[in-house]
Amino acid sequence: MTDTETVLVAGGQDWNEIVEAARGADPGERIVVNMGPQHPSTHGVLRLILEIEGETVTEARCGIGYLHTGIEKNLEYRYWTQGVTFVTRMDYLSPFFNETAYCLGVEKLLGITDEIPERVNVIRVMMMELNRISSHLVALAAGGMELGAMTPMFVGFRAREIILSLFESITGLRMNSAYIRPGGVAQDLPPDRPTEIAKAIADLRQPLREMGDLLNENAIWKARTQDVGYLDLAGCMALGITGPILRSTGLPHDLRKSEPYCGYENYEFDVITADGCDAYGRYMIRVKEMWESIKIVEQCLDRLRPGPTMIEDRKLAWPADLKVGPDGMGNSPEHIAKIMGSSMEALIHHFKLVTEGIRVPAGQVYVAVESPRGELGVHMVSDGGTRPYRVHYRDPSFTNLQAVAAMSEGGMVADLITAVASIDPVMGGVDR
């Protein structure tokens, strides 16, 4: 090695100390168990490295990275509008929140937040609240299955199917639809969709009541969840925990109330809290939040008025009032006639807008929305070009997984499953 050479040493930091201590321990007293990444109770490809003594968890570590997609890096090579098709695939159980957070950031950089049409904000809120219900249904269904309650799983996924079918009829896709766009939405609601949404809401009430009847006062369910996965307010504050976990400590923190966006200040709903700081409280919060979401969707239907679904500035937005063609590429006869029927300059402008993208002024912003799992934040940096310089997501699943050790160490292995289920992590959001 010469004086001009640099040697970089990559170490495991505190993990090295754990390994050294493990080598000196009595092998008969401690066992290291890998739970996952292929395990039915880890909510995806989550690896849990557990040190156990008998049935007691003495140490718990999360191993992540098995679902890494490089989405944040890919955004640096795509136009601002194209980014929506990437971010919708991160937390795949709540794609509309990913899309909305991204679009709110772009709109804030462009300075057009106050120009977004009222109909757009109503549609965004409605889609997010429907998505919140579907996400909570998966959380409760999967959590029930992991604890041996199979009937709630069937009820939850059957109810979720109602919402996914609704998404398909509105956006064309059940999941990852890239429906929310900077400046508006991809296309307006079809004429009969408000009636269909109202019917879906009516159909959801029965399975939600059934879910509560099955679990709320179930003695076995309460024995498995009460006083399990305990994390108090001080622990949540120290770890940056948000969402139902934080609200289970009694703190009514909800960005829809504290920092409203998309017109949430115009809707009447309650922030659901609990005071047990345990898995049962988080379960009850999710159950009651679904009913609050139904109230918000009903208010959205009342507030839905005719109007544009994209900002009027054609230098920034694609025409959203045009019907999509049968090939899904947007080249319906109406689309072609409107773009080519005005002038050659209009056609050239539309071509450049699609092929080169919009230019976003240089700057950086942070925006956050209240996702089903907590605060979903986006730190967005623009250098003034047609592509983002950097987009970083603060995904609540990533942050909330820090609580696994605090919730489970000192408890039983079976209670670890309950703790992870109450966190409700989605690995697509963790491994971006």
Swiss-Prot record:
This protein's GO CC annotations: plasma membrane
UniProt xrefs under Gene3D superfamilies: Cytochrome-c3 Hydrogenase, chain B
Keywords, in A-Z order: Cell membrane, Membrane, NAD, Quinone, Translocase, Transport
Topology in the lipid bilayer: Peripheral membrane protein
InterPro entries: NADH_Q_OxRdtase_suD (IPR001135), NADH_UbQ_OxRdtase_49kDa_CS (IPR014029), NDH1_su_D/H (IPR022885), NiFe-Hase_large (IPR029014)
Keyword Metal-binding attributed: no
Keyword Transport: yes
Residues spanning the signal sequence: none
Family: Belongs to the complex I 49 kDa subunit family.
Subunit structure: NDH-1 is composed of 14 different subunits. Subunits NuoB, C, D, E, F, and G constitute the peripheral sector of the complex.
Record's protein name: NADH-quinone oxidoreductase subunit D
